[in-house]
Amino acid sequence: MSLASSLESLRKIDINDLDLNNIGSWPAAVKVIVCVLLTAAVLALGYNFHLSDMQAQLEQQAAEEETLKQQFSTKAFQAANLEAYKAQMKEMEESFGALLRQLPSDTEVPGLLEDITRTGLGSGLEFEEIKLLPEVAQQFYIELPIQISVVGGYHDLATFVSGVSSLPRIVTLHDFEIKPVAPGSTSKLRMSILAKTYRYNDKGLKK
């Protein structure tokens, strides 16, 4: 059958005459057209499904790419600053170690007690007590509490406190208590104070 005759037969076909329950009785040209349409529909659906799947994969890969870019940027920044960070940490450790080594050793503590006593006597005070209390160990240093009790005038006490704070070694003052020596008299005052100096703890630093 020629193409012209096929087209002519299609024009003569009434769709209402086609029996859906008996597709085999349909004209050959109609069968071919239906097959072509069904094939095209199947291909279109499959192509659309494939495109949707590819789109989802592309979006997932794009998100993963963005995450990898951020990770790379962070690691690149860390790598660029790693040497500077190491140098800074080394400098801090050296400075901290140097500061700790300025603390008095065991052999220097008696000299510190002499300095405190000399400062008090030079301020016009009378010592009632100056004694070392039990040590308190910390990680990098050891506290050496010193209980001090002195008697003198108000300005003499102030001069003593200022002098102790100015000593070359680190000394901190705590728990001030000032009372008149005689009830009702302010000419002589008794001051009890806890001084703390700090000894270098080389064992703690090595840890």
From Swiss-Prot:
GO terms for cellular component: plasma membrane; type IV pilus. Its main location: membrane. InterPro entries: PilO (IPR007445), Transl_elong_EF1B/ribsomal_bS6 (IPR014717). Keywords: Cell inner membrane, Cell membrane, Membrane, Transmembrane, Transmembrane helix. This is Type IV pilus inner membrane component PilO. It is a single-pass type II membrane protein. It comes from Pseudomonas aeruginosa (strain ATCC 15692 / DSM 22644 / CIP 104116 / JCM 14847 / LMG 12228 / 1C / PRS 101 / PAO1). GO terms for biological process: type IV pilus assembly; type IV pilus-dependent motility. Inner membrane component of the type IV (T4S) secretion system that plays a role in surface and host cell adhesion, colonization, biofilm maturation, virulence, and twitching, a form of surface-associated motility. PilN/PilO heterodimers form the foundation of the inner-membrane PilM/PilN/PilO/PilP complex which plays an essential role in the assembly of a functional T4 pilus. Pfam families: PilO (PF04350). Interacts with PilN. Interacts with PilP (via N-terminus). Interacts with PilM. Disruption phenotype: Deletion mutants lack surface pili. It is found in: Cell inner membrane. The chain crosses the membrane at residues 26-46. Disulfide bonds: none annotated. It comes from the Bacteria. The keyword Transmembrane applies.
